[in-house]
UniProtKB/Swiss-Prot annotation:
Originating species: Moringa oleifera
InterPro entries in the cross-refs: Chitin-bd_1, Endochitinase-like_sf
GO terms assigned for molecular function: chitin binding
GO biological process: defense response to fungus; killing of cells of another organism
Biotechnology remark: Has potential use as a flocculating agent in water treatment processes.
Database matches in SUPFAM superfamilies: Plant lectins/antimicrobial peptides
Lineage of origin: Eukaryota, Viridiplantae, Streptophyta, Embryophyta, Tracheophyta
Cysteine-cysteine disulfides: 4-18
Name of this protein: Morintide mO5
Length: 27
């Protein structure tokens, strides 16, 4: 479904969730 989850466990579809520069990983 395109959701990305941040290192803090919050999920969304915008770059703030999906950006690897923010330590996030796509599922």
């Amino acid at each position: 479904n395109g959701l990305c989850c941040s290192q803090y466990g919050f999920c969304g579809t915008t770059s703030q969730y999906c950006s690897r520069a923010n330590g996030c990983q796509s599922n």
